């Protein structure tokens, strides 16, 4: 997908972060869901078809211990808002994942807006580590770096310093843990500059 962070770049960062054993791959909107109910898994999913070049990156994770599906969306959009903006909804993904479980029931968990991006389409490398961690929102080394803000305040100047600190914290984390990021830091930071984020929205 032609975006600020392409699939190859995302896979390289994810490999550096040690998420490989859990990572199913990068997918477009046709991601089939989590079909192996007994395995911890995560995936990076775009809201558009691969043939379009991509629009917005989301991260999903599956925790079999609690039949819990996690979503990390840097913008914190609701299912209704994602459908309105991108014609993408995750209810179908949940239904497909639930059909693979013994009792056909899953728990759904999301997160406040963090708006941290490594890529024009809203992907944050925090997505990959958040999803790969067995307890994605608890004691996670990247999620604990970030401060969420209410979704309704995403465009408010009041939260801009928080969002900027989130992005800088993520860059520092990736610089410490990803050889790929270190080798391509100047290009990645230019492509994902905070001001560019505002222009793209």
Swiss-Prot record:
Q: Which Gene Ontology cellular component terms are annotated? A: host cell nucleus; virion component
Q: What class of enzyme is it?
A: hydrolase
Give the keywords, sorted.
Autocatalytic cleavage, Disulfide bond, DNA-binding, Host nucleus, Hydrolase, Late protein, Protease, Thiol protease, Virion
Induction, as annotated: Expressed in the late phase of the viral replicative cycle.
Which EC number applies?
A: 3.4.22.39
For this protein, the activity regulation entry reads: Requires DNA and protease cofactor for maximal activation. Inside nascent virions, becomes partially activated by binding to the viral DNA, allowing it to cleave the cofactor that binds to the protease and fully activates it. Actin, like the viral protease cofactor, seems to act as a cofactor in the cleavage of cytokeratin 18 and of actin itself.
Q: What is a single molecular function from GO for this protein?
A: cysteine-type endopeptidase activity
Q: Cite the active-site annotation.
A: 56, 73, 121
One annotated GO biological process: proteolysis
Q: Which Pfam families match?
A: Peptidase_C5
Q: Which reaction does it catalyse?
A: Cleaves proteins of the adenovirus and its host cell at two consensus sites: -Yaa-Xaa-Gly-Gly-|-Xaa- and -Yaa-Xaa-Gly-Xaa-|-Gly- (in which Yaa is Met, Ile or Leu, and Xaa is any amino acid)
Q: InterPro entries from the xrefs?
A: Papain-like_cys_pep_sf, Peptidase_C5
Task: Give the site residues for Cleavage.
Answer: 53-54
Location of the protein in the cell:
Virion; Host nucleus
Spell out the HAMAP family in the cross-references. ADV_PRO
Subunit note: Interacts with protease cofactor pVI-C; this interaction is necessary for protease activation.
Homology family:
Belongs to the peptidase C5 family.
The job of this chain, per UniProt, is described as: Cleaves viral precursor proteins (pTP, pIIIa, pVI, pVII, pVIII, and pX) inside newly assembled particles giving rise to mature virions. Protease complexed to its cofactor slides along the viral DNA to specifically locate and cleave the viral precursors. Mature virions have a weakened organization compared to the unmature virions, thereby facilitating subsequent uncoating. Without maturation, the particle lacks infectivity and is unable to uncoat. Late in adenovirus infection, in the cytoplasm, may participate in the cytoskeleton destruction. Cleaves host cell cytoskeletal keratins K7 and K18.
What additional remark is attached to this entry?
All late proteins expressed from the major late promoter are produced by alternative splicing and alternative polyadenylation of the same gene giving rise to non-overlapping ORFs. A leader sequence is present in the N-terminus of all these mRNAs and is recognized by the viral shutoff protein to provide expression although conventional translation via ribosome scanning from the cap has been shut off in the host cell.
Instruction: Specify the protein name.
Output: Protease
